[in-house]
Amino acid sequence: MTQNECFQIAKLALFNVKLLNELENIGHEELKNLIKDVHEKLSIEQQPALINQSTYLQFAYVTLVWLWESINIKDKDDFFIKLKARAHKRELAFPDAHQISGERVISDWKMLVSLLRNALSQGNVEIINEAFIFSDQKKFGKRKEIVPTTLNISATELANISETVFWTINEIIVPTSK
């Protein structure tokens, strides 16, 4: 697949998130009945909201792992400069120090994206209510870590970080984008 084809797949994931959010906000009776029917067919314990933890996790994985690997960003330093600028423009705050624990210092977007990507790709994500705890631990090599480094963020923060990475990737692929 080309970079643009990969990006279009990730764009569909973003479309799904935005569409589900809009549908959930509409709240028509027919839609509620449809959700209830699917819920019962799948035997899910509690009826989920259209936008739920899996929605955010799926979009994060598609963007931060699959799309990232598919397009192979050549100049990562330039990417992270653009990501920081886009985050600032979107008024996306970097996670506070109290949200991060462990041996590793996570002080910039490059380190943050690395932690998220590693945790997502290795399945080291814990979900507690509306929050995600991402864990990453270097167990091999010269910089082996005794304890994992964790990041505790809300679903909204994860969505905003993922979308900011998404649009920054778009800017790399199509330089005249948003």
Question: How does the language model describe each region?
Answer:
Residues 1-141, 148-178:
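Amphipathic alpha-helical interface elements
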